[in-house]
Amino acid sequence: DKNSYRAFRNLKDEFDNWDEVAGQSRIKIEKQIKIAGLGKQKSGAIKNFLFSVKKEKGKVSLNYLKNFSNDEILTELTKYDGVGVKTASCVLLFSLKRNICPVDTHVHRTLNRIGIVNTRTPDKTFLAIKDKIPEGIAHSFHTNLIRLGREICKPAKPNCSVCPLLKVCNYDNKNLNNSIKSKENSFMLLDNV
């Protein structure tokens, strides 16, 4: 997500390290991340997490997690207020380079529509798929599903006629109206899946 990345870059550009961020006020953190939305809520969670890790481990670092299993890391990270399954799974994928596919609303919706899962919440979708992603593809699987969900498999009026997964999709309410304008879907990296 562009805005999340920009918020991350703002923090990295403004402060020298995560220990410095931990010492900042929630308002200063919020100023740097507001572009990503929910600035007050997220800044509080970030401050709480960084402060707690620094207090418990002596410095802000995720290195202590490297020898933990994925499930142990999920348990460890979600014990902090404001850190849910999605955030913890993003840490696993993006920071610790684990083969984990975080599940947001787009991933949840597309996997349910296609018929890969039959779950009611993103967290339940995550639990259903977390150990089933073939090694080495979680990152591309995650990013392609997000893009598919944003650009084609939208919540209302999905553009099913251009979907590369149309033939395998189990969604009952397919919208095959060709009049919907769509961006070219050459972004799909499904050959890797």
Each PLM stretch: what is its role?
Residues D1-N185, L189-L190:
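Catalytic cores of DNA base-excision repair glycosylases
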Residues V193:
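Acidic, metal-coordinating catalytic segment for phosphate/diphosphate chemistry
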